[in-house]
Every structure is written in C-alpha cells, then in structure tokens.
UniProtKB/Swiss-Prot annotation:
GO CC annotation: cytoplasm
Top-level taxon of the source organism: Bacteria
Induction annotation: Cell cycle regulated at the transcript and protein levels. mRNA levels peak in predivisional cells.
Keywords per UniProt: Cell cycle, Cell division, Cytoplasm
Domain GST N-terminal: 3-85
Its job: Essential cell division protein that must bind to FtsZ for division to occur. Critical coordinator of envelope constriction through its interaction with FtsZ. Promotes the formation of highly curved FtsZ filaments, reduces the GTPase activity of FtsZ and stabilizes FtsZ polymers. May regulate FtsZ function by modulating its superstructure. Does not bind to glutathione.
Similarity-based family: Belongs to the GST superfamily.
Origin species: Caulobacter vibrioides (strain NA1000 / CB15N) (Caulobacter crescentus)
The protein's name: FtsZ-localized protein A
Domain GST C-terminal: start-end pairs: 90-223
PANTHER family xrefs: GLUTATHIONE S-TRANSFERASE GSTA, GLUTATHIONE S-TRANSFERASE-RELATED
Amino acid sequence: MSVERTLHHFPLDPASRQVRLALGEKRLPFVEMQVRYWEMPPEFTSLNPSGMPPVLVETKHQRNLVICETRAILEHIEETETEPPLLGRDPAERAEARRLLQWFDRKFDNEVNGFLLHEKMEKRLLRMGAPDLAALRQGREALRMHLGYIESLLQTRDWLAGRRMSLADFAAAAHLSVIDYFGDVPWKDFQAAKTWYMKLKSRPCFRPILADRWPGLAPAAHYDDLDF
C-alpha cells in the first residue's frame, strides 16, 4: 500500500524548501499545507510543539507517522526511499554532505538569514517596523563570505559535497533561494556559484520553489528566471 504524505510548511522557509526539494527529486507525491507558523495555530503546534515547520505526516494503513524538524525528515526520506540517493554513495561523501547540511542550517542561518531574512521578511510578517540598515549590511557581508566558501568547494568538485548532487546542494540552494527572492544575492560577483545555482534551478524539483509567492512580499524580477 502506498504512503500518503502531507507536508506542513511555509513557502519562504529555507528548512521547508529543503524537504520539498528532496521529495521532488525523489518524485514522491505529497499534499502541501501552508502554515502561518508565527501565529502558533494549535492544529500545527499539536503536531510539532516547537511550532516550527516543516512537519511531514505520512499515512499508511490508516496510521499516521508525524516527523518534525528538517534533518529528521530528510534522513527519514533517505532511509525509506533510497533512489536516487541524496547523501552520496560512499561514506566520505555522506559525511561531507552531513557536514555541509550542518554548515548551512546553523552557520549560514545564523550569520545570513538571522539578519537578512529577519529584517526583510520576519519583521514584515510580525509588523515589527522597518529594516535595520546596519543589520542588513552585516547580513550581506556574511553572505559574500558564504558565497566565497561555496566557490572554494566548487573549485575541486562538481557539486558541494563531491561528485554527485546531494542534500548539501539542496540545503545551500534552499537558503540562497529565499535570499534571492528578495534580490540580495550578488550573483555577478560569484560566477561559479551562479553556474552551480543555475543547474539546480533548472531541475524539475525546483519549479514549485520558483512559483512561490506570498501576499505583500513580491519576489525580485529575476527570481524565477532560469537564465538570469
């Protein structure tokens, strides 16, 4: 019997986007339930007490399996749906992919999203006032450092973790895609990173990401352009 999947997510959440990309790449159908997580709806917090997306609910034989938090969901998908593998085919690549997942979900999130997305998105959603220019500047400086790191990896690799595309690429692209939604990625100064991102952006699993829109938050003009 097939598994029915429902993903509770917020379209402009990098963590949610990672899961959507993984499900799409493995061609696993799922129903989307968009959640305004900042309002702490009880039907959502009953699934995940932390109140944060994404949450994946799998239904099989009329029984629900609720999986919370990005890494747990990604590891579950990889364990239960093994093709195509998204953590590498050898231990070294799997270890490197996991290291980079942690890099983007912790270091990039703290140093870049914690400033740019907080100022440009969270403040708007929570009606916290105008963006702080000093915080935006700090986030943009950190973003350039991370883009430089991506380029250093790509000097000797086809993809971030090695020879094959992996969840590390999806993690990086998920974070960058939300920053790019607001037009803050200086692609012209990082051509190797831009070429890598264009390859990901052209994959079928990325199409729903490029179609994302949120009322009152319009994307940059080039956001859904495959040849930007």
